[in-house]
Every structure is written in C-alpha cells, then in structure tokens.
Regions:
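Conserved C-terminal helix/tail region of periplasmic/extracytoplasmic solute-binding proteins
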Residues: 313-338
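Short beta-strand->loop
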Residues: 101-110, 122-125, 220, 236-248, ...
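Periplasmic-binding protein-like
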Residues: 130, 192-196, 203, 234-258, ...
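Early extracytoplasmic/lumenal segment of secretory-pathway proteins
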Residues: 24-92
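Mature extracytoplasmic/periplasmic domains
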Residues: 257-317
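Extracytoplasmic ligand-binding site segments that recognize negatively charged/polar headgroups
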Residues: 34-42, 66, 80-217
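A ligand-binding cleft/hinge motif common to bilobed small-molecule-binding domains
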Residues: 90-93, 214, 219-237
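A bilobed periplasmic-binding-protein/Venus flytrap-type ligand-binding module shared by bacterial periplasmic
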Residues: 133-140, 176-179, 250-263, 281
C-alpha cells in the first residue's frame, strides 16, 4: 500500500512539473485588416512568427478609428492591443497623449533599413505605402482619366465613387480637390463644394469600392494602386492612374502600445513585418510598396509599386496638424453632404 501511495505521489509531482503547452503560451494581440490582407498576413507573418517564438498571435480585424477608440477608452496602462497597426491619420492624438512605446531598433533592427520618410515621431513607422489615384473600368468605353478634374466628367454621372471624410483615402482626396478648386490643400470649403457637385457614391471602406468596381456599379473611383493591382491580378478589367496634379500617400503605420506587457515580442513582430521576406510577400501578393529600402522585388512587381526613384515625389501630410482641425472639417462635411 505504501508503495502505491509513493507511486501516485511521484506521478502527481511529475505531472505538475511538466510543461503545460498552450496554458503557458504568451498571446500577442495585434490589429489587422480582414479579407486578402488577413490571408497574406497569416501565411507570411503570423504562422512563421508563432512557430519561431512559440507564441499565439491574436489578430483583431477592423479599421483604425475603431481600434483607436478602444485604446483611448482603455487608457495607456491597460491597452487592448500590444501592436497597433493602421492608417496614420488616426494616430496623432494617442501618440501625443503618450499611448505608444518609444521606437526600439535594438529589438527591431530592420527599422535601420527604412526610408527616412517612413519614420514618424519617436514611436511609429510606416511599414507599407500605397499611392492614392483614380481607378477606372477599362471595358466601360470611357476615356482614360489623366487628371483629378476628370472625376467631374459628365460621362461618369451616377457611376463614380469616393469615400466619406472619416476614411483616410477620403480625406486625402478632399485635400487634393481643395487645392485644385481652391487656394490650397486645406481650403476645405472649396473641396466639399466640388465633391458635393459631383454627387458621387460615398462609402466608408476601400474594400467596398473594390466590390463596386468588380460588379460594375461604378466605372471610376478613388482608390490606391495596391487595391487596383489586386483587382487586376484577379482578372477584373481595371487600371490605375496617377493624376497629373499629384498622388497623396496611404501609409500603413505601426507602433507598440506603451502599456503592453509583451513589448519585446511586440517589437520582434514589427521587425518581422519589416523583414525583406514579409515586405516582399505583401508587395507580390497585394502590391503594397515596401518601406524597407533593402527589399529587392521581381521586375514585374517593382514596376507596379513605389520605388527608390519615387520617394522624393510622395505627398505626405502632417496628420498631427490635421488632427487639430479635423473635427470642424468633419462637421462641415456631415452638414453639407447629407
């Protein structure tokens, strides 16, 4: 009997000291988009990272403004995410209020390989860039647009689409149009009046415009080059144009939250995002332009994305300054565009 008790005691001790697998596994919470982005992110980034570091990466899908609202509500010391990724216009306020960790290139050495324009303040960085221009159906019988002003051509009446001001592409489009029809990028009265006159279909997500183009609900739309090239890659008869007046940039920005309990892993995930392998995957599969200047792309992909010779031409706005005036611009937009 004594031997049996000893054996049971030994088994309990062995079981209690054995590794508990998933029960001890760290979970890293990151934000990301759905759809095709999610597919490429899982294959190129998440699965290899989980395997290498024995962690669980939980991806919260949505849009930048939703994630920032959740972060601000939770407070800087108890963030719902370890890694916050999205469009830059949503981030100046939480950055100013100390929600983000200082950039760490010892944990993420690929930061040293970024174009200087990709560094934002002391906390953040752009991982990918896309150019905002005009996308049109090549089978619609309309002429190829060359200028932003072509958006107002009568041939597109009822068949053109853009975004609400809350969308990053939407406010960039508003700025460009404000300069064309007014005094400068921030002559919002002129820009809103011009867009109102065009009476476009208005959406809040770029994926919606991609569906509109695919289903031929519209034949001309404001869209980034990456989204257009993805449509073309799937056999949709569309083409993208860089209007003659210039193309603003849609930047995909990332940072580690200050209150994260997993900062070292969080920065390592960002380093993986910036690696030539992952940057190449996003360029090849989704046509997002790498911000890591050491990335060497296949020639057929390099022709479709931003290259070293394009960097000086990029139109990047000071979103920290924009954030101070955005509420009043949004109020005007909502009042005029109802």
């Amino acid at each position: 009997m004594k031997g049996a008790v000893t054996l049971v005691t030994l088994l309990i001790a062995l079981l209690s000291s054995a590794p508990r697998g998933d029960a001890q596994q760290t979970t890293l919470v990151v934000t990301g988009y759905g759809g095709r982005w999610s597919e490429v992110m899982k294959k190129a980034l998440v699965e290899p990272f989980e395997k290498k570091h024995n962690v669980k990466v939980e991806v919260v899908t949505g849009i930048s403004t939703e994630w920032v609202a959740k972060l601000m509500a939770a407070g800087p010391d108890n963030p719902p995410f370890d890694v916050l990724f999205g469009n830059e216009p949503a981030f100046p306020i939480p950055r100013e209020r100390g929600f983000f960790d200082k950039r760490d290139d010892t944990l993420a050495p690929n930061i040293k390989n970024l174009y200087p324009k990709a560094l934002i303040g002391e906390t953040s960085l752009a991982m990918f860039w896309g150019r905002i221009g005009l996308t049109y159906r090549t089978d619609s019988g309309i002429k190829k647009p060359v200028s932003w002003k072509d958006f107002w051509d009568d041939a597109y009446t009822g068949k053109r689409s853009t975004y609400v001001i809350g969308n990053t592409l939407g406010i960039n489009f508003l700025f460009v149009i404000s300069k064309i029809f007014g005094k400068d990028y921030f002559d919002i009265d002129a820009g809103v009046a011009a867009i109102k006159k065009a009476q476009p279909k208005l959406v809040d997500f770029s994926g919606t415009i991609e569906k509109q183009l695919e289903q031929k609900e519209v034949v001309l739309a404001v869209l980034h080059d990456a989204g257009t090239n993805d449509l073309k890659n799937r056999g949709i008869p569309v083409d993208w144009v860089a209007p003659s007046e210039g193309t603003p940039i849609l930047d995909q920005v990332v940072q580690v939250t200050r209150g994260s309990k997993n900062k070292e892993l969080a920065w390592k995930l960002i380093d993986a995002y910036l690696s030539p392998e992952v940057q190449t995957a996003f360029a090849t599969e989704l046509f997002w332009s790498p911000t890591n200047k050491t990335v060497k792309l296949p020639a057929d992909v390099a022709r479709k994305v931003i290259g070293p010779g394009d960097i000086d031409k990029l139109v990047l706005f000071d979103w920290a300054q924009v954030a101070k005036q955005r509420p009043q611009w949004t109020e005007k937009w909502n009042r005029e565009m109802r």
